Amino acid sequence: MDMLGLILAGVIVYEGCWQLSEHRERKQVYNHARAVADFNNASLLVIGCPKWGLWHGHGDYTLDLIHDPRWCVCPNPITGDIRDVDKMFMWKSVVVFSSHVLEHLTPSEGQEALNALSKIELAAYHVWPNKKTISGWVSPWHKSWPSVDNDGDIIFEARSRQ
């Protein structure tokens, strides 16, 4: 195998390991959110449609910007913007699980979404791509890097496109 082939194989293995790690994290966090919702006799709101059903389960309600039946075959689909979630769920408190959603928002949009969620959530669990993944960097739809600060708050770092 020539040098280019070795480099390509290394990149594929590197990204594959990260994707498996993220898959495991999504499953674990989703299962925890589901258990918290069940324990509290609350609805689970999944934000970010589980595309093709591979990454995590559905919620009692599932919110996505676009309802595409090829991707999102779930009970109670809701098409809408995460920043308006407090207007959609005024009548109840929910446990929130969002998967690979927050990075699609600018820092100001992300803060707006978290503020809306804080009005309806009993508990919230969020996952997003790791900053070390290649797919996280090359996605043209990612607008920020969410992370957790020392106080446990979610913060957003603007993406630079250089």
Which residues make up each language-model segment?
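Conserved N-terminal segment of class I S-adenosyl-L-methionine
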Residues: 2-95
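Flexible loop residues that form catalytic
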Residues: 65, 101, 129
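Short, surface-exposed linear patches
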Residues: 67-69, 82-87, 100, 118-120, ...
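A short beta-strand submotif of the Rossmann-like class I SAM-dependent methyltransferase core
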Residues: 79, 95-101, 110
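S-adenosyl-L-methionine-dependent methyltransferase catalytic module, highlighting the catalytic core
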Residues: 107-162
